[in-house]
Swiss-Prot record:
Alphabetized UniProt keyword annotations: ATP-binding, Cell inner membrane, Cell membrane, Membrane, Nucleotide-binding, Phosphate transport, Translocase, Transport
Entry-linked Pfam families: ABC_tran (PF00005)
Keyword ATP-binding: yes
GO molecular-function terms, A-Z: ATP binding; ATP hydrolysis activity; ATPase-coupled phosphate ion transmembrane transporter activity
Gene name of this polypeptide: pstB
GO cellular component: plasma membrane
Descriptive protein name: Phosphate import ATP-binding protein PstB
Amino acid sequence: MSPTAGENILLKAEALSVYYGNSLAVKDVYLEVPKNKIVAFIGPSGCGKSTILRCFNRMNDLINGCRVQGRITFHDQEINDGRVDAVELRSRIGMVFQKPNPFPKSIYENIAYGARINGYQGDMDELVEKSLRQAALWDEVKDKLKDSGLALSGGQQQRLCIARTVAVQPEVILMDEPCSALDPISTLAIEELMQTLKEQYTIIIVTHNMQQASRTSDYTAFFNARATEGGGKMGYLVEFDTTEKIFDSPDQEATADYVSGRFG
């Protein structure tokens, strides 16, 4: 039985493979992402976690020589169909990157800019406040909205990037190691925020932090890599299941070894 049986599936990958030029980077991934859940991608460096993550909003389209095979469906629609507009897709499936990357604009404009480009016609002040509240940042910045977003601390900048993402009203938030550059207190703030956000959004997070995956996610996908001829690596999905099962009683020995710290 599928680990997501009975869930409302929002995103699905089937026979998903990614090539860089002629090199196969990730092979034959199958997984389902349920709505309003947090899915963690874990695994050693070079196993394709971030590559697969970027497939879900077609960020790999921007990488020269990158080619995707297989199917990804969002609301049962194939996202690589020529009729799907990639820019519109990215407004529905937003992304938060590893390093906080606020625009060199005011805190207010960091939120308003993307919403304006996406045609938002409502009360902008209201949207800015709502987005900052959703990112648990409003109380810290409400009196300095005209200040540069770059003047904030690293943890605040990352929450500003999350606020910027939710301002365009996506359904899914992709997070590529969002806490790797943050201190433990800022990391905890992001993790607590994720639990609140999943009430309205579906979240996929790539993380190297086993404790973070076990604390925050509902489902976990463990990726590994094997060496290829020519000295490269090919990533593949070892196991996908509920986070409880992955960490407590995984089916694959490699998964047990990784989550227990015996390799990685």
